[in-house]
Amino acid sequence: YIQVIFICWLSINSITEVYGKDPIGISLVKWSFRTQTAILCDMAKENGAVAIDMVDLEKWDIVKEKGLTVAMADGIDMGIERGFCDRRWHSSLIENYKRFIPLLAEKGIKQVVCYSGINTDLSDEEALEACVEGLKPLLDIAEKANVTLVMELLSSRNTEEIFTKQRFSYYQCDNPEWGVALCKKLNSPNFKLLYDVWHMNDMGRDIMSDIKKYHSYISHYHIAGIPERKGLNRTDSFNYQQFMKLLKKVGYQGYVGLEPDRIEKNLKSTIQESITLLKNK
């Protein structure tokens, strides 16, 4: 009984060390803010973010030296379009991830992104089986390294609107039902989903309902201003405070990555206002 209490205390204490009193940490997605990594780290710390997100190998040490966490590693994949549902890329993808997962463990990085890729030929079930074939060889090494492979849910909506460049036509993992089916097939604690709020809203999803249903399969979230994918704003059509409250209610203890579309001006004010909204201040 005493041992159980001690373990619980350690768990709570480790969360507090990382996030402060809040079990949810805010991270800034590297590609979204057009500035040097070190400068972005400083902006993050000034505004209460605790991590940098989607960080390439060569930038890992910069983030750590600044006293922040790498919330999600990037750059190990072959791009969003060339993913695990296409068997042509399996050998290269498996080689890449097998080589880099031990490095992630060495650096204390717990998560790395991966993608389904686009699918123009297979049925959903066939694409599912292809992903299982490609990902299964990685699970043993990921489990031993305590690194989680996280597949991102992205919008595949085909449209000529201005934000089309941030959508990916024929992207396979464009809904949580398919993603959860993949999680169940792989049956590993080291394979989870990245739920991108902007992308899933673009697909017409009920975000709150998805979180209630599928939160146990989700280890990471990305968010941007809805609908225009800028920084978060009080006039946006999405209730960011209710989103954060729901994450806490379902027991989420991870990062929410701020991922607007390539902010080049007013970075400080964009970061400050967005984090203020997420922290409900």
Task: Show where each model-derived region lies.
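Conserved radical SAM core fold
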Residues: 77-82, 119-121, 156-158, 224-230
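Active-site acidic/histidine proton-transfer and metal-coordination neighborhood
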Residues: 86-192, 202
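Short, hinge-like loop/turn segments at secondary-structure boundaries
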Residues: 69-73, 89-90, 130-131, 168-172, ...
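Hydrophobic residues in well-ordered beta-strands that form the structural core
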Residues: 70-72, 151, 195, 258
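Bacterial Sec-dependent N-terminal signal peptides
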Residues: 1-21
